[in-house]
């Protein structure tokens, strides 16, 4: 059947569709006709925004129905704001909007003055001068709107030493906020504070109102010992070592403690938890290692093995490695020998490009294997090309590559002749002689590939 799509400029587009087409399909057809990427399209019918996965039939869209097309500003996105009454407000925002801007939009919609609004996301109160991007608020995130009661109230916090602190708070303050106020007054970091009221330990994301804490209530403050805890380390001989650690200890620190107890040099230690080899710079907290967790200690045999790395110039480098070395480690060894930064190195073995986090063992690289080193030219970067079928192709390119070059790379990967390719970026069709830099296409940008029908009239 035919339907019509009306744009804000007043232009009407005619599309051939079927009732079973999804909104994604319709947006792809609009992209074919108009070159507008689907992620910049919002379709409205009968006052409702249409969701990608649903079909025309779901919305009772019939032949000769008219949809309205609204363009999302680049970086533009929708977020939701939920009030304490349960009402949800939808806002059009951009990542660069400040919290002030968002409060002004809420005022426009709901009439609530910004100075009475407190916005909460992920248990944190948002500060006016910061942006949505600062808080990693992404499209379709939900913020919570709490109204500031004019005035607030006082509560008391009693420490184990018997000292009482007075705080100015509001019922809508979260426990995080209260701990931050205690830190301001007393210098105690929030992660060392435990607050107790009516015999219950209070959770960070909840509000005072949630716990029915009212004016002049008294909370009790108990100090958490600095993340201190015991963990166990089990060796292959079956021996178990007990260590005193903190969540913030790095794996290096833990290996040093093992050396103190057992005399094993850190460079011969490999620590395993939950089947994963632990990396030196990371902390116990990063791996969610908690009190009384058991790590497994495997000794690295001194010696390892030799492998060869062959460069495009024909030079061969010899490296001392171990099967458990990651590709990152190997690149670091190449940097030590040759001075080539890891981010300019691509390593190939058995025709496969090797990924940084994987080990030599993962790729079955054994002693005296030969890897091939290809240099990524500076300015080299990856971009993505998305086809109408939804497939995404990854290409290695440079900013100075022309659109012709990119089409040739797509032909190499996919077999599609360049004269059948149309590339779209930011709603624009890209011209052959221009470069990626001309269009401000940067690393990890996504281009859209539309096929020119043979004999088409583009």
Curated annotation (Swiss-Prot):
Cross-link (Glycyl lysine isopeptide (Lys-Gly) (interchain with G-Cter in ubiquitin)): 48
Organism: Petroselinum crispum (Parsley)
Function recorded in the entry: Ubiquitin exists either covalently attached to another protein, or free (unanchored). When covalently bound, it is conjugated to target proteins via an isopeptide bond either as a monomer (monoubiquitin), a polymer linked via different Lys residues of the ubiquitin (polyubiquitin chains) or a linear polymer linked via the initiator Met of the ubiquitin (linear polyubiquitin chains). Polyubiquitin chains, when attached to a target protein, have different functions depending on the Lys residue of the ubiquitin that is linked: Lys-48-linked is involved in protein degradation via the proteasome.
Miscellaneous field: For the sake of clarity sequence features are annotated only for the first chain, and are not repeated for each of the following chains.
Family: Belongs to the ubiquitin family.
InterPro entries from the UniProt entry: Ubiquitin-like_dom (IPR000626), Ubiquitin-like_domsf (IPR029071), Ubiquitin_CS (IPR019954), Ubiquitin_dom (IPR019956), Ubiquitin_ubiquitin-like (IPR050158)
Propeptide residues, chain positions: 457-458
Any single Pfam family the record assigns to this protein: ubiquitin
Protein name: Polyubiquitin
Record-level GO cellular component terms: cytoplasm; nucleus
Membrane-spanning intervals of the chain: none
UniProt-annotated location(s): Cytoplasm; Nucleus
Domain of life, source organism: Eukaryota
Keywords, alphabetical: Cytoplasm, Isopeptide bond, Nucleus, Repeat, Ubl conjugation
Cross-link (Glycyl lysine isopeptide (Gly-Lys) (interchain with K-? in acceptor proteins)): 76
An example molecular function term from Gene Ontology annotations: mRNA binding
Domain Ubiquitin-like, residue spans: 1-76, 77-152, 153-228, 229-304, 305-380, 381-456
